[in-house]
C-alpha cells in the first residue's frame, strides 16, 4: 500500500539482523513476504515494488570483536545474550568509528529480470530472486584495504599487497587485530580466523560475483 498506492519509499532489511561473519545473504522469507500482496501474479507482486538493492560497506566493521566472540562461542553451544546486550550492540553500532562508509544503489529488480524465473515453483522462485539480489548487493560492495589485508593474512598470502593496501594500512589493521589477545579463549587461533573472516569474506563474495 505504502509503495504502490502512496508512492512512498520503504527500507527493508534483507534478513533478521546484519550478518556477523561478513557473508550477507537475503532471507528467502523476505521474497515470499513480498509476494503475498498478489499471490495470483508473482512477477507483478515484486516488479511493482521497484526493489532497489542497497549495498552498504564499512572500512571498520561495527562491533567486530563482539561478533567474532559470539560466533566463536556459538560453535560448541548456543550463544545466550546477556541482558541489555542487543541495546548495547545497537548503540555501539551507531556510535562506533566506521571509517569510510559507502552506499551503492544497485540496479533495480525489473519485471524482465523476474520473468527469467517465471516457470519456477514458489520456493525455487524465491530462492533465485534472493540470489539475484545478493548478486547485485555483492557487486555494489565497496571493498576497503582492510578487506584485502584480512584476506591475505587469513590465507597466508601477499596477493593484494601494493595494489590494494600499503604497509602502513596493514600495520594499522594489525594493531586493531592485536586487541583480540585480551579475550581469554581456549583456541585463540580460531577466534582470530573468525575475526579475519568478517573482513575477508566480502572479498570472496565480490570476486565470485564479478567473475
Label each residue range with its predicted role.
Residues 1-10, 17-211:
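Membrane-interfacial terminal anchoring regions of lipid-handling membrane enzymes
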